[in-house]
UniProtKB/Swiss-Prot annotation:
It comes from Geotalea uraniireducens (strain Rf4). This is Chromosomal replication initiator protein DnaA. It comes from the Bacteria. The lineage of its organism: Bacteria, Pseudomonadati, Thermodesulfobacteriota, Desulfuromonadia, Geobacterales. InterPro entries: AAA+_ATPase, Chromosome_initiator_DnaA, Chromosome_initiator_DnaA-like, Chromosome_initiator_DnaA_CS, DnaA_C, DnaA_dom, DnaA_N_dom, DnaA_N_sf. Residues 1-69 are annotated as: Domain I, interacts with DnaA modulators. One of its GO terms (cellular component) is plasma membrane. Residues 330-449 are annotated as: Domain IV, binds dsDNA.
Length: 449
């Protein structure tokens, strides 16, 4: 059966990218076969969970195509440790207990720059960052085991630094003696230049090479800087060979960083590469809700949707908008509303709503309620038409720049007082009827996205 599994792996390899195959399928080994139960070995709980969720049907199909049997597949976490990256027993720090206290304390405060707010608990996980989040947790739980180095890449403001520091905070919380270094590549370079100037390179090298965990942010800034890359290369090798964990972030995939030396690029590809994509609208709303709770800001759902629907995918920019609204509300003693948000943020937010027309809203609402647009615009008083009409008018007022008279004209020439009545009617119903509120918010979300 082991030969069958090797052949199944070979077939799976043909349909996956090399990185995906090497990360998830290649480490799996045949264990036992009992009747219709096939047990495969995986090197970690993380791989077990990820493969079960993402690749189990593919594995079942690959094996059944060779054996004509659909086995019940189970994964067993093996106690074996991959030869490529052996962890130190019990993750023992570099410093020994019997060393002098003066030496023990040297450079320990290097972890002081780990922002305590950046934890896994405060990180909002969504489809766009699920892989990077899971990989970071796996590294933090078992440093220098299966994913060394860990390379996280993605655009500006998507959470790379948050995950990087969360790894450090988690390890620090569970191992007080662990020596953790978090540096930006720019800080690494500046410190190296300083030490070169004052002939303290031995001190510089010892400082980094005595670390248990090295966290380097924005590695792309080393590109084109030969001396810095040379020094980092030797630091990387020293730590890797000592089975110390290395985590690096970048705004690009290693191969896409111009000016990055091939020897560094290849080393980054030794471990696991995880990307963070721009968050979808649901994740952005979840982030805003989490941040508003942490900052004791009352953020209405429609305002959260408005912020999340802005053109930006930069999480830091979203947080900045939230803090700005919270500060204004606090200083003026007012509640945050959609109109306030539009006014306060008009200089920085780009609304997608500018592209939404009354006609688009009419068509979308009519399709949702399974009526004709002509019926939506008519004067028919049946509830079947009145409620959708009022909802459509309300959304037109929310998502377009059209005035009451302009909206009335698009709804069969209705008087502006009728339009105002419809808007107020839906506002009142949304405050008292959760079903109506959900319908309106979902329709708005569908139109915006």
């Amino acid at each position: 059966m082991e030969k069958v599994w090797l052949e199944a792996q070979s077939n799976i390899k043909k349909v996956l990218t090399p990185q995906t195959y090497n990360t998830w399928i290649k480490p799996i080994r045949f264990h036992t076969l009992t009747d219709d139960n096939l047990t495969l070995e995986v090197p970690s709980k993380f791989i077990k969970e990820w493969v079960t969720e993402k690749y189990l049907p593919m594995i079942v199909e690959a094996i059944s195509s060779l054996t004509s049997v659909k086995y019940q597949i189970e994964f067993k976490i093996t106690e074996k440790i991959p030869l490529e990256s052996k962890p130190v027993d019990n993750f023992t720090p570099v410093i020994k207990d019997n060393e002098p206290s003066k030496e023990t304390n040297k450079n320990i405060d290097i972890t002081a720059n780990l922002n305590p707010k950046y934890t896994f608990d405060s990180f909002v996980c969504g489809a766009s960052n699920q892989f990077a989040h899971a990989a970071s947790q796996a590294v933090a739980s078992n440093p220098a085991s299966n994913y060394n180095p860990l390379f996280i890449y993605g655009g500006v403001g998507l959470g790379k630094t948050h995950l990087l520091i969360a790894i450090g905070n988690h390890i620090k919380e569970n191992n007080k003696k662990a020596k953790i270094c978090y540096y930006s590549s720019e800080k690494f370079m500046n410190e190296m230049i300083n030490c070169l100037r004052y002939k303290k390179m031995d001190e510089f090298r010892n400082k980094f090479r005595k670390m248990d965990i090295l966290l380097i942010d924005d590695i792309q800034f080393m590109a084109g800087k030969e001396a810095t890359q040379e020094e980092f290369f030797h630091t990387f090798n020293a730590l890797y060979e000592s089975h110390k964990q290395i985590v690096v972030t970048s705004d690009k995939f290693p191969k896409d960083i111009p000016g990055l030396e091939e020897r560094l690029r290849s080393r980054f590809e030794w471990g696991l590469i995880a990307d963070i994509q721009p968050p979808d609208i649901e994740t952005k709303i979840a982030i805003l809700k989490k941040k508003s709770d942490l900052n004791s800001i009352t953020l209405p759902n429609d305002v959260a949707l408005f912020l999340a629907s802005s053109a930006t995918s930069n999480v830091r920019e979203l947080e900045g908008m939230l803090i700005r609204l919270g500060a204004y509300a606090s200083l003026t003693g007012s509640e945050i509303t959609l109109n306030m948000a539009r006014d306060i943020l008009k200089d920085i937010i780009v609304e997608k709503t500018k592209d939404i027309t009354v006609e688009m809203i009419q068509k979308h609402v009519a399709e949702h309620f399974k009526i004709k647009v002509s019926e939506l615009k008519s004067d028919k008083r049946l509830k079947t038409f009145v409620v959708p009409r009022q909802i459509a008018i309300f959304i037109c007022r929310e998502l377009t720049k059209s005035s009451y008279p302009e909206i009335g004209e698009k709804f069969g020439g209705k008087d502006h007082s009728t339009i105002i009545h419809s808007v107020k009617k839906i506002e009142k119903q949304m405050a008292n009827d959760l079903e109506i509120k959900n319908i309106v918010e979902n329709l708005k979300k569908e139109l915006i996205t």
